[in-house]
């Protein structure tokens, strides 16, 4: 609270009393009322068709058993024409007329058309291996083909799954490893076109249990959740891999041949690579199957526990199926009716605890939010909107910031702000009695030690000092030079800067220089957008409590100073793309609280009771740790007299309200009656029976009243004692400070110039829960946070008159979501498998038709002197590019030359010609003209080399040394 602004009226302030700071301290899908389809009804058609197989075979020449009805699902609520079926009498008798036979053929063609296939009759089928049976029982009397078993195994209609030209596999057979399951009503159609095969009861039948388990539950809005999308991706990949593996099974002769030495190298490479590819595919299938089961178990765990599929609903099914289910509901077994009655009874039965007057908590315990008393579970949705890091519902254009501190340990409440680029954190005290935002900077010799290091202005790429010549931004005095370092490499002493001086009612004072930079409320993880603010204060001097306090600076949220210098909140209110309402709220608890900019928190309010009554000192009041059931029964408590009380603001210098008086049990304070003073009580005494509530009245046209409970004006001290927060400030004006704000949500409406009060259950935040700043070494230990990844958005102040870029997106805290991490992991696994396959294919060597060559030495080297003539001849052969280090010819010839050199040492009159692969006894002199000639002693000591000796194993007459061409083929 600023000093020297006292008047006859009272005003609200966050300044405390004279006490100094001491040691710190799945959307549930709608359930259908109809009974769930019984597996007995689904298999009834199959058993009946199998039982009539002898009759159908006896009359094969004239007729065949009819196929089941096929419903084409083209859209929601559209009923399509069903294929004509055979009457029950004709089925039971086993005989049909010519007309019935014609209807049967038409039925099959209609069903085939629904499936998007071309039906072929018995006479046109020929010797095709693929069946075209459309009934559930497999009426052809032929064992299922490979294509049908492949479809049953893969669950995906893939072109690789069929060997014949016909596209309709057998959906179910007696030898199928997977029995058909009832297809859920309202679910998407099966894979074969847009149709499903139904049983006798009219229920669609699914060919796979896997397809039912993988069927996702769609959102009512039509948007699938991310986990459902991930499950669909896993199902698709698994199905494709299953199809590829079974496709390899269709061609065992081509892919399983053993290596043949007479075959060409390319065929051998293809055979080996195909076997390696099969092994890799099997390993990949196992991996994807494990991932699918793991992901599907978490998605469908709740569905498996329920006897009724959660997506069975008449409203979501096609009209034909819905009407059919309604008509045939009377034919359901009695057991299903009983189960349906139990489920309806459970839905109509009140929740456990409501019978006893209790309600359950609707917010998670870890969120720090307690449901407001007076609200029942039926009044609030069980599945609320998504919450943010503070456990509150996410709202657009609303900024939130944690408040830390307490009345006893700190005597103030503070929040964190991020300043500069890259951001640096500063802790600032929330003050409704001033309008200055300031904190110490690096180089301040008269500043104390605080929670965070002093801001280094030279590190900020977006900061700039405010010059005295800038009259539109400088409203203070001018400095003639300070010891602070400059922004952008310059010192502030080189020019005259805009300066500020601020004093407070408890005797503290600060002095510093203004600068402009970007500022964001809260921690980095909250991702509140930063804004450009031209009036950030940089301390050069601190006195009294500012030196010893833990918080670094001050954050004033009062009205602008002199109606010219806007506060940080005024800058945010000036742009509609940031906030919708010019309103902020403060909710303070025993330890910590919450600051909300752009609105208030309705979920934290305490709802009023059904009936209001006069105040009673015996009434119970909600305190910390009290159950919700006890709070709900408080129907006579004056704490719930009004949900929200508004009073007008009569002055814009501070938040001044027309306070008319305070009354305690009929006694008006300030009329000669002694106040409570610093009374101490025992912690075990019932406060509600000793200390009465205080009724605070405001002198506006509505005669607004707010109740001030002992939990607010009493605060805990050490040793189990309490002290009251009432004190005489020795001036004529009254101050409603922290003790009045406690356990209330105070709303400051700047548009309508009013202040609102409402009882609330404010969240608590302790200092050990405070995250670390952008620098890993800043602040106490806690959860690390990431700095800004992009430069902050520059938002001009209202006086600039410039436009504001809209739709600015803030950097995300995590680069990828959990669903994206799953997809990235799958892609990494696939990339590794592809790399292993390529390596295996490249490691397969092509065999040569010639005999084996001598292995290359580990470190091949020239067996002669560097400047000798043999070296010249050897280098000449290599220079033509015919021979290389990895060439077998080069390796073989080098090995032979070394063997000759070991037998007879190399001399000057013997040379090796690499191109001709032979030794010569004389020097042509056409390679190195400056070669040194060996001395006479060396010529005498060196033995002569004769290539024509019969005893030499490497004679020049041996033609085998010259048979190999240079290419090695």
Curated annotation (Swiss-Prot):
<keyword id="KW-1133">Transmembrane helix</keyword>
<feature type="topological domain" description="Lumenal">
    <location>
        <begin position="23"/>
        <end position="820"/>
    </location>
</feature>
<feature type="region of interest" description="Disordered">
    <location>
        <begin position="128"/>
        <end position="149"/>
    </location>
</feature>
<feature type="region of interest" description="Disordered">
    <location>
        <begin position="608"/>
        <end position="635"/>
    </location>
</feature>
<feature type="region of interest" description="Disordered">
    <location>
        <begin position="173"/>
        <end position="193"/>
    </location>
</feature>
<keyword id="KW-0812">Transmembrane</keyword>
<feature type="domain" description="Peptidase A1">
    <location>
        <begin position="413"/>
        <end position="758"/>
    </location>
</feature>
<feature type="region of interest" description="Disordered">
    <location>
        <begin position="79"/>
        <end position="104"/>
    </location>
</feature>
<dbReference type="InterPro" id="IPR032861">
    <property type="entry name" value="TAXi_N"/>
</dbReference>
<protein>
    <recommendedName>
        <fullName>Aspartic protease 5</fullName>
        <ecNumber>3.4.23.-</ecNumber>
    </recommendedName>
</protein>
<dbReference type="GO" id="GO:0006508">
    <property type="term" value="P:proteolysis"/>
</dbReference>
<dbReference type="InterPro" id="IPR021109">
    <property type="entry name" value="Peptidase_aspartic_dom_sf"/>
</dbReference>
<comment type="similarity">
    <text>Belongs to the peptidase A1 family.</text>
</comment>
<dbReference type="Pfam" id="PF14543">
    <property type="entry name" value="TAXi_N"/>
</dbReference>
<feature type="active site">
    <location>
        <position position="682"/>
    </location>
</feature>
<dbReference type="InterPro" id="IPR001461">
    <property type="entry name" value="Aspartic_peptidase_A1"/>
</dbReference>
<dbReference type="InterPro" id="IPR001969">
    <property type="entry name" value="Aspartic_peptidase_AS"/>
</dbReference>
<feature type="compositionally biased region" description="Low complexity">
    <location>
        <begin position="311"/>
        <end position="324"/>
    </location>
</feature>
<keyword id="KW-0378">Hydrolase</keyword>
<feature type="compositionally biased region" description="Basic and acidic residues">
    <location>
        <begin position="335"/>
        <end position="355"/>
    </location>
</feature>
<comment type="function">
    <text>In tachyzoites, plays an essential role in the export of several dense granule proteins into the host cell by cleaving the localization motif RRLxx (termed Toxoplasma export element (TEXEL)) located downstream of the N-terminal secretory signal sequence. However, can also regulate the export of proteins that lack the TEXEL motif, such as GRA24. Requires Arg at P3 and P2, and Leu at P1 in the substrate TEXEL motif and, specifically, cleaves after Leu. Cleaves GRA16; proteolytic cleavage is essential for the correct trafficking of GRA16 from the parasite into the infected host nucleus.</text>
</comment>
<feature type="compositionally biased region" description="Basic and acidic residues">
    <location>
        <begin position="769"/>
        <end position="781"/>
    </location>
</feature>
<feature type="transmembrane region" description="Helical">
    <location>
        <begin position="821"/>
        <end position="841"/>
    </location>
</feature>
<feature type="region of interest" description="Disordered">
    <location>
        <begin position="922"/>
        <end position="969"/>
    </location>
</feature>
<feature type="signal peptide">
    <location>
        <begin position="1"/>
        <end position="22"/>
    </location>
</feature>
<feature type="topological domain" description="Cytoplasmic">
    <location>
        <begin position="842"/>
        <end position="969"/>
    </location>
</feature>
<keyword id="KW-0064">Aspartyl protease</keyword>
<dbReference type="Pfam" id="PF14541">
    <property type="entry name" value="TAXi_C"/>
</dbReference>
<dbReference type="GO" id="GO:0004190">
    <property type="term" value="F:aspartic-type endopeptidase activity"/>
</dbReference>
<feature type="region of interest" description="Disordered">
    <location>
        <begin position="1"/>
        <end position="65"/>
    </location>
</feature>
<feature type="region of interest" description="Disordered">
    <location>
        <begin position="768"/>
        <end position="794"/>
    </location>
</feature>
<feature type="active site">
    <location>
        <position position="431"/>
    </location>
</feature>
<feature type="compositionally biased region" description="Low complexity">
    <location>
        <begin position="1"/>
        <end position="45"/>
    </location>
</feature>
<feature type="compositionally biased region" description="Polar residues">
    <location>
        <begin position="952"/>
        <end position="961"/>
    </location>
</feature>
<keyword id="KW-0333">Golgi apparatus</keyword>
<keyword id="KW-0472">Membrane</keyword>
<dbReference type="GO" id="GO:0000139">
    <property type="term" value="C:Golgi membrane"/>
</dbReference>
<feature type="region of interest" description="Disordered">
    <location>
        <begin position="311"/>
        <end position="382"/>
    </location>
</feature>
<dbReference type="InterPro" id="IPR033121">
    <property type="entry name" value="PEPTIDASE_A1"/>
</dbReference>
<keyword id="KW-0645">Protease</keyword>
<dbReference type="InterPro" id="IPR032799">
    <property type="entry name" value="TAXi_C"/>
</dbReference>
<keyword id="KW-0732">Signal</keyword>
